[in-house]
Regions:
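A glycine-rich, often tryptophan-bearing local segment used as a flexible ligand/cofactor-contacting loop or short
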Residues: 345-434
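Short beta-strand-to-loop junctions in surface cap/lid or active-site-entrance loops
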Residues: 49-58
Length: 487
């Protein structure tokens, strides 16, 4: 368990996180379940984990698959989160990352597969051809697993590239199935699909992006269609839309729909949409749970880079979160929340006052905060939209520049590299880093003490030893100021 040693860090450039101790904090009654983990295709290069959560109480068996298409990550991430939900009845089986190599390479197809087998979701049996077998190792292994587990329900989580409701494809092109529920229409499935659509659409404000029902049934040779027609199972494909929406939004949409489905089936007894990781345990091998903000005001590429950097650190579970996730029910599951580069003011506007208060409460309860560039502006105590987590004043405002007119002082030019030096305190935190180093810089905050009521003085961990200057009034204002602080 963690949450006892975290502080707030403001980074003008880059970050690494360690640490903490407090419970799951959700008040969820977790039934006594039997948990089983194994590998689909064990020993093969493409092997991928599956998870079985058996409540030991009579109820339906449900299979959830994600990541069959590698460029559709929201389904894989949602499935990975859903596998941690507390099951009250029945058995929940989850294969989150079926096409693992495709997900790693962000490609729809199976990397290096022959052309006729590269689309994994066209490799399954068909009732129209009883002699047809699954094509390729992955489809064969997954199909054998489905047959062996014998679920009553199969939910395959996908993403389309455009919103079906508003997509207008060119002549001869197929309409995208993004933001839809695909099923073969019958009374049982239609009633459930309507309930899922109703609830998820409450979270969608743009009418052109709302979910639609496609009762025509899944395409032939897809996993869902084969499960339906060959094995006679209830099967659905849930589609979000990966263009124009950030990853946490789409992942939450999948969780929302599956929450409706599992509650209607009597498998969960409480709202689980906000459950994104496993419950806390007293296991000494517990991982640090890090939330990365990935929504308006934050660079999506920056969020990707933060996640990549964390893969090689202390055992870490990373969750990408959006503005709707800035609530106690989600944050209480984390050890650290990271806000990366972008615009601090836009991040503040996106999370809103309730989200800001949730972040403050999370930190006050012992959670960690890492602010990088835009996130460092956000956690300062300077602006009326600031979180007031660190006692930092920000060098900003406008100055008159000859031949230019008023110039904002926070703008220092294009991305460059500057030199920083660790302080004695910084060397204890960043023991694996050299004393002086070049780091990437792009208009991060130049800070000094604010003396904000209720905040303790910050501790500098690194100092700028060079500076970037765009206008004469900026000269000398960056050198020897903090590059990284903790508070």
């Amino acid at each position: 368990m963690f949450r006892h040693a975290f502080r707030t860090f403001a980074f003008c450039l880059f970050a690494t996180v360690f640490g903490t101790d407090v419970g799951f904090g959700q008040g969820l009654a977790t039934p006594v379940s039997r948990l089983e983990t194994g590998m689909l295709g064990a020993g093969r290069p493409w092997q991928t984990p599956y998870y079985i959560n058996d409540s030991n109480v009579d109820g339906p068996t449900v299979l959830i698959t994600g990541g069959i298409h590698g460029n559709e990550p929201a389904g894989a991430r949602a499935a990975e989160q859903i596998r941690h939900w507390p099951i009250a009845r029945g058995k929940l089986i989850v294969v989150p990352r079926v096409n693992r190599f495709g997900l790693d390479q962000n490609t729809r197809f199976i990397p290096n597969a022959v052309d006729e087998q590269k689309d994994l979701n066209r490799n399954f049996p068909s009732s129209e051809d009883p002699s047809r077998l699954p094509r390729g190792e992955i489809a064969s292994a997954l199909w054998d697993f489905v047959v062996e587990q014998d679920p009553q329900w199969v939910f395959d989580l996908h993403e389309g590239y455009e919103f079906n409701r508003s997509h207008q494809p060119k002549a001869g092109k197929e309409k995208s199935v993004g933001s839809s529920v695909i099923y073969a229409k019958n009374e049982t499935l239609h009633e459930l699909a309507q309930s899922m659509q109703l609830v998820v659409n409450r979270t969608v404000t743009n009418p052109n992006r709302k979910f639609v029902l496609l009762g025509r049934g899944p395409k032939l040779t897809t996993l869902a269609n084969a499960s339906r027609t060959v094995l006679r199972k209830n099967a659905m494909i849930l589609e979000t839309t990966y263009n124009f929406q950030r990853l946490p939004t789409r992942t939450r949409q999948h969780r929302t729909m599956m929450d409706v489905a599992l509650r209607r089936l009597g498998m969960i007894e409480v709202d689980c949409v906000d459950v994104v990781v496993a419950p806390r345990t007293d296991d000494g091998d517990a991982q640090v749970v890090v939330g990365i903000y990935d929504d308006s005001g934050c660079s999506e590429g920056g969020a990707n880079n933060i996640e990549l950097a964390l893969r090689d650190s202390h055992p870490t579970t990373v969750v990408r979160l959006g503005s709707r996730d800035m609530r106690p029910q989600v944050l209480d599951q984390l050890d650290v929340m990271v806000f990366g580069g972008g615009s601090g003011s836009k991040q503040a506007a996106s999370i809103g006052k309730e989200g800001a208060e949730a972040v403050r409460s999370f930190v006050a309860a012992g959670g960690g905060y890492v602010g990088i560039c835009g996130g460092a502006y956000l956690c300062s105590a300077y602006y009326d939209w600031s979180l007031n987590l660190v006692d930092t004043h920000v060098f900003t405002g406008s100055r008159d520049v000859e031949g230019h007119g008023p110039a904002p002082m926070w703008v220092r030019g294009e991305t460059t590299h500057v030199e920083v030096q660790l302080t004695d305190e910084g060397r204890t935190v960043f023991a694996d880093f050299p004393d002086r180093m070049k780091v990437k810089y792009h208009n991060g905050p130049i800070v000094s003490p604010r003396l904000f009521p209720g905040l303790t003085p910050y501790t500098p961990l690194a100092i700028y030893r060079s500076e970037q200057v765009l206008h004469p009034p900026q000269k000398g204002t960056m050198i020897d100021t903090p590059a990284i602080v903790s508070g």
